[in-house]
Amino acid sequence: MFGIWDLKPKIKMTSTCVECPVKGCSQSVERQHDHFRREERYYCPDHKIYISPSTFEYANEEDNLLWKSKPDLDLLKAIKTVKRESRIARDNSEDALTWNIFRFLEITNQLGGLLSWLTQMEHAQTELIYWSYSQKTKEAWS
């Protein structure tokens, strides 16, 4: 995962090309228009990302995740059975942000404490529902 310090403050682009957003990279790719596409002509082979004028997407979505042990990836795979779409591989992905923060709170058993602090009520037991997926029932939550 690239951090803010790994990226150029501004990327150069023309009507036909966009440069790779990673500092020190001189690769340029064809400029995407309209819809984001994962095609070779938009790919930086040095950094394994697909580039558009406004975002980039990792070729491997795991590269955008902080929590990617086998149990984490198994859970993510199960979640995708009920989740309609995923943009978790995009650099500015709300899905990746949600996963990285809430998975941390869940793994470190801090979710109940955070909820108790936010609501000023005790929350001894919590169940985190990721995108309508219940880990308890292993299906869409209802």
Language-model segments: which ranges?
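Charged, terminal alpha-helix-loop-beta segments
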Residues: M1-S142
